[in-house]
Amino acid sequence: MKRVFRKVFPLRKEPTPVPSLPENIEDIRQKALKGHHLEIVQWGQVLLDSVYVPKDPASALEWFTIAAKAGFGPGHNMRGRCFQFGWGCDQDLTEAARCYEEAAKAGDEWGRYNLGILTMRGIGQPQDLPKALDLFRTAAQNGHAKSMNLYARFLEEGWVVSQDRAAALDWYRKSAEGGDYRGQHNFATALADAGKIDEALDWWRKAVVDATSDILLAMNQKLVLLGEKRDTALETRVQRRLQELGVPVPNSAAIRPA
């Protein structure tokens, strides 16, 4: 009897089933599957960190790469984020800088900002303050709030540019109005230094919602130094947020005017 040999193929791994998603998230996924560049990046961001699906940074990077290969700036920017922080890949700061460079060339302001940060600090490439200034200035002029804040800092300090504190204040204001908590804190600080305490407090109240620990600590110090004009309710909010972040709250009595 003739024996029949059958070629055995390995079983293909079944794709991980996608849980039931809210309508807006499912719409993003479907558009991503159809090749829409914006939704490709958005779906990658869902996979990167979302309550709707299990975190899958490696798959997120694959989606960002698809968008980047299509020349889509936000795709390059998110690839840069992955390489900068080691999301779904080994950390590679040089590659992160290259991705941000591509994002900036494609006109993505977040990519321009992120490249500016690395360039300013000499991360993944040699430090180049004139280049960083140019990146922040361009992104600021194009409406990027975080870049407005850093462009203002260059102007305030006179870093590789003529010092212009009036222009710096104007850019801090624009950054604050654009919703950047660092810009809001810096603008509030300038207002307080000019004696415009009520206006300053209004901006600090906005900043406290999203501020990171470094800004919260600086804000707490400024609030304590207001003395009789201080807003104790706002101080309490700032200190509560620091506690939530696991940051020790400085003793107010230890904070003294410089």
What kind of region is each of these model predictions?
Residues 3-8, 215-258:
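Terminal, low-structured helical/coil segments at or just beyond the last alpha-helical repeat
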Residues 34-36, 49-51, 69-73, 85-87, ...:
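Short helix-capping/linker turns of helical repeat alpha-solenoids
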Residues 42-49, 78-85, 112-121, 150-157, ...:
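Hydrophobic face of amphipathic alpha-helices that form TPR/SEL1-like repeat modules
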Residues 73-74, 107-111, 143-147, 176-184, ...:
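Boundary/linker segments of alpha-helical solenoid repeat arrays
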